[in-house]
Structures are given as C-alpha cells and as structure tokens.
Amino acid sequence: GYDFRQSNRIDKAMAGLRAKLETAYKASGGKKVNIISHSMGGLLVRCFMSMNHDIFSKYVNKWICIACPFQGAPGCINDSLLTGLQFVYGFESFFFVSRWAMHQLLVECPSIYEMLPNPNFEWKEKPIIQVWRKNPEKDGTVELVLYEATDCVSLFEEALQNNELNYNGKTIALPFNMSIYKWATETRRILENAQLPDTVSFYSIHGTSYETPYDVW
C-alpha cells in the first residue's frame, strides 16, 4: 500500500503506480486512464511522469490535480519540522497522535523534505519563517528573527541539533537529516525536469485570493 512517509519517487511507489495504470488500461479494453491526484499525490504522479515518460504517455489520457504543492508547502512543512503537526484540539486530542509524537515522526520522513519550498521558483513574495529568539549579546532580550523559507536549512539544523527520542531505554538522536535533505534535493530536480506528454491533457485546480498573514495567494 501507499506510505505517505516515504519519498514520492521510491521504486516501490513507481512500480505500484505503473502496475495500477496497466491494470486499469487492460480492464477498460485499452482505453487510456484519467488520473485525479490530490495534494502530495500530485508530486508522486509528477515524479512518475518524469521518470517514466513513455509509460505515462501510453496509459494516461487526462491528469487532474487538486491543490498539489508543486513548489512546496512552506507554511505546513516548515512548521512540521520545527514544532510538528496537530490535527485535533481540545478533549479529542487525548485520543490522537500528539504534536510532539508527530514531530518526531516527520523529522525522518523523506516526503516532508520533498515539500520544502522550491528555492528556484520565482515567488511573488518569498515565504518567510518568523522565530522569537533570545539574543545573548543583548542580555537575553527576545527578538523576532526572520528567515527566508527557501534558505533556512541552517535554522532547522540549529533547532534540531539536540532533538532526540527515548525508546525502550535508549536515546535516539533525531536531528535535521541532511542525507534525506540531499535525497529531496534530487527529487526536486526530477520534478522540475518533468515534461507533460503532448497526448495528455492536464488540469490544475487550486484556490486563489486567499488571505494569509503576509499576502494574498
């Protein structure tokens, strides 16, 4: 089955999607398939298209994307790496995965690193991270420090340098994983090299004019 934690271009995912396309193609009597992808699923499909261009062209008729983060998901991903994610609040949160537990999981997920903001994209307004930090040179005065989200690896490394998990009496270090980051950088290259076949129709569905704390997208 599909594992959202893994990279969007691992062999198992690519082979699995190919098998499903072939099965659907044969079951329909040789008719091409229409793919509908949502959110990160769009990255998986785009990786497949980039790495298996001829196969994609053979089996796919239309590709419809709904809210796919092709240039990354700065707000969600940066927050995930720094503080984790919390899906449920209030009393219900006692019955769901905690923000801390989710954070420790996401730090080791290749898919999360693959949704860091694209540094090569010409953003209308570059995403930023705001962090309140003590300044030791000013008697510990707390200051608001801004980081461009497309160039904040040093922030992640510093924030997670002492991050660790205790499991079965053992302490496991969970810093910002540079090996995974390098893998994700290669994934970004694969995504950017993707070319839509002339025979495939492409539709991208996304919201516009949504007010955020800094801009309207």
Label each residue range with its predicted role.
Residues 1-158, 207, 211-212:
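N-terminal non-catalytic accessory region
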Residues 146-217:
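C-terminal subdomain of alpha/beta-hydrolase-fold enzymes, centered on the catalytic histidine
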